[in-house]
Regions:
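Conserved AMP-binding A3 loop
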Residues: 45-49, 178-180, 187-211
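AMP-dependent adenylate-forming
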Residues: 5, 23-47, 155-158
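Conserved structural elements of the adenylate-forming
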Residues: 52-57, 168, 174, 187, ...
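Conserved AMP-binding/adenylation subdomain of ANL enzymes
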Residues: 210-227, 235-277, 283-295
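Conserved AMP-binding/adenylate-forming core of the ANL superfamily
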Residues: 33-80, 84-88, 105-110, 114, ...
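Conserved pre-ATP/AMP-binding loop-to-beta segment of ANL
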Residues: 33, 147, 152, 160, ...
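Structural core segment of the AMP-binding/adenylate-forming
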Residues: 64-65, 92-165
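Conserved ATP-dependent adenylate/AMP-binding module captured primarily in the ANL superfamily
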Residues: 104-134, 168, 210-229, 262-276
């Protein structure tokens, strides 16, 4: 198709530079001292600067384990800081995050492992036994299993490693890569719960992520001064992309972590953290409404 100008430079720049990760890194530069993650249950928070440093440590650890472009990193994680780090770290080195439903039974988890053949599995401490059973059932054996978000103080299974030990001593510098990113690179696989059949994976490429972020940013609208709490699991489309990690880290606002929905905590956190957007299913909102009627909280920030 002929143009009235030479579009080759624009096409090259758009296809290789207009990535979700570049948007995130823009926020690291602009808002390095601004909160990116707030975890009320552990009383911890990460700024965009400190988050990026931890993401880089995770990415370097993955590289040390031989993870490279198009390899799969499987995350069976509840909403947690570890999920946020897992959302960004693999794409820094060209790997694909498989966001698995942590509620799956061990047989279904084994099916996902055999189908996707992840090189690394990172999982929440509360599903340790499910992962151990899945390991026994699946044919594919990951090279590393990482126990993360260990608020239960679970013992580390033999042959596994804690997330903290895994990233210990790793460089905070940007990881080196030997490829040029492209907007059509697969960066994320979302897994259905298997409601109508066996669990399946849905591939999302980088431009899917960028356009999903833009859609939410424009529709809400979101800005860097917002604080978002998605009350649903981040492993699915609604949790990840509706005020979850995807648009929030792209626009530069804060994400408040909620591992399991609790109406009272939700209302308390709105006031405490000046939350501007709450996302959830109708059932969540109905429960919030009842709790607010019983014990009114200051929701003026919403």
């Amino acid at each position: 198709m002929s143009r009235t100008y030479d579009d080759s430079m624009f096409i090259d720049t758009f296809e290789h530079e207009y990535t979700w990760l570049n948007g995130f890194m823009r926020n690291v530069r602009r808002f390095s001292a601004k909160n990116a993650i707030i975890d009320p249950e552990t009383n911890r928070s990460w700024t965009y600067g400190s988050m990026n440093k931890e993401v880089n440590r995770f990415a370097h650890a993955l590289q040390k384990d031989g993870v490279k472009k198009d390899d799969i990193v499987m995350a069976a994680l509840r909403n947690s800081p570890a999920f946020a780090m897992s959302y960004v770290a693999p794409r820094k080195i060209g790997a694909i995050l498989l966001a698995a439903n942590f509620n799956l039974a061990s047989g279904e988890m084994a099916l996902l492992i055999d189908h996707n053949k992840p090189k690394i599995i990172i999982y929440s401490a509360n599903i340790k036994n499910v992962i151990l059973e899945a390991e026994k059932k699946c044919s594919h054996k990951p090279e590393r299993c990482i126990l993360a978000d260990n608020i239960e103080n679970e013992a580390i299974p033999e042959g596994h490693v804690s997330y903290e030990d895994y990233i210990e001593g790793m460089s905070e510098d940007e990881p080196q890569i030997n490829f040029r990113p492209h907007i059509y690179d697969e960066v994320l696989r979302l897994c259905t719960s298997g409601t109508t059949a066996l669990p399946k994976s849905v591939p999302l490429n980088d431009i899917n992520e960028v356009l999903s972020a833009h859609d939410v940013i424009m529709h809400y609208p979101l800005n860097p001064n917002d604080a978002c709490l998605n009350m649903t699991p981040w492993f699915h489309r609604g949790g990840c992309h509706c005020g979850g990690p995807c648009p929030s880290f792209y626009v530069g606002c804060a994400v408040v972590v909620m591992r399991a929905f609790q109406p009272k905590n939700t209302l308390d956190w709105v006031s405490k953290y000046s939350i501007t957007f709450l996302m959830g299913a109708p059932a969540n909102l109905e429960m919030l409404s009842r709790a607010q009627e019983r014990t009114p909280k200051d929701l003026s920030s919403l």
